[in-house]
């Protein structure tokens, strides 16, 4: 087996590493640098430039220079993040089959194709360095990338001619690089703030085990957003002074982006910098220049709300791990944006301890990916990497309830099954609506996709057994299947997620679950009691019909009255849980004789057979 390379495919920069002779090391590119800009450019001569050469000509070729492509990877064109990208990026974002794509000189490219060009360069640089062909790779993604984004990343690798052995989470990869040589068990936090994404992960490392305890983040927050705050400030100031909106000029916008990025870097070591952009534009009165002094304090005022979001997420994730901050031994800083002083100050203040800067924030993720590649190949033995799923997964059941099948924080890969049944008599098909989130009701969670299982033989409600299986592989990609146990008919869907989770959706999922915990509980209890009442009424009606004349007239009248009372109460959508339970109790009492007659009618072993058959059936029904 040839060498396995580890790749950190970043929003701003990418890095490749390899494990050989007992250590993981970064592979420099042909230009002699350890990182390669994730930039692709198409020239008028038909050339395709990748990396530094593409970045250098961005100002003169803004509409054909593609950067930050990771921000639209796996997104649909109608998503908020895609709409935001269209206003920020100078190149033409369009759509292909509803998904984001790029149009350059009349040709459509998918984000996978653009990313593949970056991966191809990394592959070629690795082959030149190692002196041999490279095919196998481990590629990292943000922990909060959804299934569509993970799948798109894997597809980019395939397009680049790579056999992607594994997709692993960036903070987990960093922890693998940091914690491999740790003999004593310790709990650490990896704070990963890159160019376009943010993750925070709590892990336990030691004795060659790296276990994720909790993870969280925002797939649309990073250094690009810091730059955008500064771009907005500069453009608005210039407009106030001259009346000219630089955002309408793609070349000026590209110059602003470069200036903002450089100012951000300079303010990491200096208290003040000057942004000087001569001949940024012109009007009837002549050329215009943009000259602006910027202090670190001013810049920090622009980005403090973004940094505060990351601190809030830290608190949530540490809490999810069941830990207190003083139990965290180390805080490892990963990603180029962690060089911003305000970020370091706020994280340090949060944990009240010095930050661990022993790892290179631009290289550690690729180094960890190379280690994981060596583990898969067998060069590194006895190393165990235990990652988790960040949100619960389940399906919609009767009453619009979300029934969880895989709980948040479950170690992956994992496979779990539950058996459900039908909600109506003679129901020939069920719709499986796959959900992600922490709320009790389907409408409050994220729908990842749905599919139908058809051809179920006619049978009374509750009789068919539909086995639903959730299977998450080591790449975090979900496959859901449903099988009718009687006929063996099956249907499955690989969840590719038509859209990513927006910042608002992700933050609100867990927060809303906590805020509405009591409200959700009451609503779920009300749905449960209605389902139970409906089931009882159905069973009593069925028994009355089967027994016919065996039931005394007086008993039948009493049962029918109680049954009608319950049905009437259920028609009232405002009926309380207590009212329904009262009517259920009345029906249960008067139908006691009916139950006795049914019992006498059954053969002795029937009840035991029924119980055995139903042991694995969950008390929930699929609509």
Curated annotation (Swiss-Prot):
Q: Which GO terms describe its molecular function?
A: ATP binding; ATP-dependent protein folding chaperone; unfolded protein binding
> Which keywords does this chain's UniProt record carry?
ATP-binding, Chaperone, Nucleotide-binding, Phosphoprotein, Stress response
Among Pfam families, the record links this protein to: HSP70
Phosphothreonine: residues carrying this PTM? 197
Write out the biased-composition intervals (Basic and acidic residues).
595-615
Return the SUPFAM superfamilies for the record: Actin-like ATPase domain, Heat shock protein 70kD (HSP70), C-terminal subdomain, Heat shock protein 70kD (HSP70), peptide-binding domain
Supply the induction statement: By stress conditions e.g. heat shock.
As for what it does, the entry says: Acts as a chaperone.
Q: What family, per the record?
A: Belongs to the heat shock protein 70 family.
Q: Entry's HAMAP family?
A: DnaK
What name does the UniProt record give this protein?
Answer: Chaperone protein DnaK
């Amino acid at each position: 087996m040839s060498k396995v390379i580890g790749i950190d495919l970043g929003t701003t920069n990418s890095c490749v590493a390899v494990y050989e002779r007992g250590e993981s090391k970064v592979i420099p590119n042909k230009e002699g640098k350890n990182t390669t800009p994730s930039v692709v450019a198409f020239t008028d001569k038909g050339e395709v430039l990748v990396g530094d050469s593409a970045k250098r000509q961005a100002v003169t070729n803004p509409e054909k220079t593609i950067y930050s492509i990771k921000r639209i990877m796996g997104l649909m064109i109608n998503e908020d993040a895609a709409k935001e990208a269209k206003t920020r990026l100078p190149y033409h974002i369009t759509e292909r089959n509803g998904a984001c794509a790029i149009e350059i000189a009349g040709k459509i490219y998918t984000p996978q194709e653009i990313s593949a060009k970056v991966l191809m360069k990394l592959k070629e640089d690795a082959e030149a360095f190692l002196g041999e062909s490279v095919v196998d790779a481990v590629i990292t993604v943000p922990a909060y990338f959804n299934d569509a984004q993970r799948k798109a990343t894997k597809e980019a690798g395939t397009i680049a001619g790579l056999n992607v052995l594994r997709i692993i989470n960036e903070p987990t990869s960093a922890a693998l690089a940091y914690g491999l040589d740790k003999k004593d068990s310790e709990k650490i936090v990896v704070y990963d703030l890159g160019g376009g994404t943010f993750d925070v992960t709590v892990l336990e490392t030691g004795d060659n085990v790296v276990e994720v305890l909790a993870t969280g983040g925002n797939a649309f927050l990073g250094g690009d957003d810091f730059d955008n705050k500064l771009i907005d400030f500069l453009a608005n100031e210039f407009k106030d002074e001259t009346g000219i909106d630089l955002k309408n000029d793609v070349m000026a916008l590209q110059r602003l982006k470069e200036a903002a990025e450089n100012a951000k870097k300079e303010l990491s070591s200096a208290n003040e910098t000057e942004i000087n952009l001569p001949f940024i534009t012109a009007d009837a009165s002549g050329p215009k220049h943009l000259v602006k002094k910027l202090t670190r304090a001013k810049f920090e005022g622009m980005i403090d709300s973004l940094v505060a979001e990351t601190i809030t997420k830290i608190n949530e994730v540490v809490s999810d791990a069941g830990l207190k901050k003083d139990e965290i031994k180390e805080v490892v800083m990963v990603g180029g944006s962690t060089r911003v002083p305000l970020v370091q100050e706020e994280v340090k203040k949060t944990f009240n301890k010095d930050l661990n800067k022993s790892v290179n924030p631009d290289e550690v993720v690729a180094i960890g990916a190379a280690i994981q590649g060596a583990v898969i190949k067998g060069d590194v033995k006895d190393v165990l990497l235990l990652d988790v799923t960040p949100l619960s997964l389940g399906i919609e059941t009767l009453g619009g309830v979300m029934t969880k099948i895989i709980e948040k924080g479950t170690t992956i890969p994992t496979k779990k099954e539950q058996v459900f049944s039908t909600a109506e008599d003679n129901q020939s098909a069920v719709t499986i609506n796959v959900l992600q989130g922490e709320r009790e009701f389907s409408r409050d969670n994220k729908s990842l996709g749905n599919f139908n299982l058809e051809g179920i033989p006619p049978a009374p409600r509750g009789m068919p057994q539909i086995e639903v299986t959730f299977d998450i592989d080591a790449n975090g990609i979900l496959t859901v299947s449903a099988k009718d146990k009687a006929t063996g008919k099956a249907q499955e869907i690989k969840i590719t997620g038509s859209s990513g989770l927006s910042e608002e959706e992700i933050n609100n999922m867990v927060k809303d679950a906590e805020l509405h915990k009591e409200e959700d509980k009451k609503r779920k209890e009300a749905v449960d009691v209605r389902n139970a009442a409906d089931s009882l009424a159905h069973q009593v009606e069925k028994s009355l019909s089967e027994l016919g004349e065996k039931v005394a007239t007086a008993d039948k009248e009493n049962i029918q009255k109680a049954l009608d009372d319950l049905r009437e109460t259920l028609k009232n959508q405002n009926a309380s849980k207590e009212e329904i339970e009262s009517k259920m109790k009345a029906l249960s009492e008067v139908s006691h004789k009916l139950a006795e007659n049914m019992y006498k009618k059954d053969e002795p072993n029937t009840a035991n057979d029924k119980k055995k058959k139903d042991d694995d059936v969950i008390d929930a029904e699929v609509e």
